[in-house]
Swiss-Prot record:
It catalyses: a 6-O-methyl-2'-deoxyguanosine in DNA + L-cysteinyl-[protein] = S-methyl-L-cysteinyl-[protein] + a 2'-deoxyguanosine in DNA; a 4-O-methyl-thymidine in DNA + L-cysteinyl-[protein] = a thymidine in DNA + S-methyl-L-cysteinyl-[protein]. Keywords: DNA damage, DNA repair, DNA-binding, Methyltransferase, Nucleus, Transferase. The gene is MGT1. It comes from Candida glabrata (strain ATCC 2001 / BCRC 20586 / JCM 3761 / NBRC 0622 / NRRL Y-65 / CBS 138) (Yeast). PROSITE patterns: MGMT (PS00374). This is Methylated-DNA--protein-cysteine methyltransferase. The lineage of its organism: Eukaryota, Fungi, Dikarya, Ascomycota, Saccharomycotina. Belongs to the MGMT family. It comes from the Eukaryota. Pfam families: DNA_binding_1.
């Protein structure tokens, strides 16, 4: 059995459910949304599926961020750093690790982490970097499997023509996250949506 500490965080842009692995103090799961019951249900489903593969039972323990319980200082620090990220701040020392995903998905997520605040890249660019021929679909699937929102910044990946494409936690939230990072439509008078385009010349990240 393994303990996973969790807490809900609330910001003006959305709420989140955050899990930290007790034995490593690493962030291992973060999901976005306003419905706490649905967030917790999604987490239970994800960890139950993982449990079938790992043969480990994951024990959920809720910790309030302001709790004075012993041995939760590192947990609180991790949750506070995640909250700052969600609020649009740059945080460089948040400890996380992958509990989910395949080796290919881990490579994809590692590429996403390289995209800086205020920049975007495309599915094709990632496929080319990883040398996956015709790999945009595989990249999209890998991005959609990301279970650590914001820290693994899948909201910074767009289509080759600059349109937003989908987002696991809703396209409307993807727009808000990008605009918070000062990434706008080519015509700033237009709100970012599935039809407007981001200026890749201005915002695209090049390694």
């Amino acid at each position: 059995m393994e303990d996973l500490l969790y807490s809900f965080v609330v910001t003006d842009i959305t709420s989140a459910l955050v899990f930290v692995r007790r034995q490593t103090d690493a962030l291992v799961y973060a999901s976005l949304g306003l419905n706490k019951k649905q967030l917790l249900k999604g987490a239970r489903t994800a960890f139950n599926q993982l449990s079938k593969k790992s043969a480990i039972h994951y024990n959920f323990k809720q910790i309030e961020v302001e709790s004075e319980q012993e041995h939760v200082e590192k947990f609180q620090d991790t949750v506070n750093k995640f909250t700052k990220l969600l609020e649009g701040h740059i945080v460089k020392d948040l400890h996380y690790e992958y509990m989910f995903g395949t080796s290919l998905q881990h490579r994809i997520w590692d590429e996403l982490v390289k995209i800086p605040h205020g920049k975007v890249t495309t599915y094709k660019e990632i496929a080319d970097k990883l040398k996956i021929k015709n790999g945009s679909r595989a990249i999209g699937s890998g991005i959609g499997s990301n279970n650590i929102a914001i820290v693994i910044p899948c909201h910074r990946v767009v289509c080759s023509n600059g349109t937003l494409s989908g987002y696991k936690w809703s396209t409307s939230l993807k727009r808000k996250l990008l605009e918070r990072e000062h990434v706008y439509a080519s015509n700033k008078k237009d709100a970012l949506n599935k039809d407007t385009k981001i200026s890749l010349m201005k915002y695209k990240y090049s390694a």
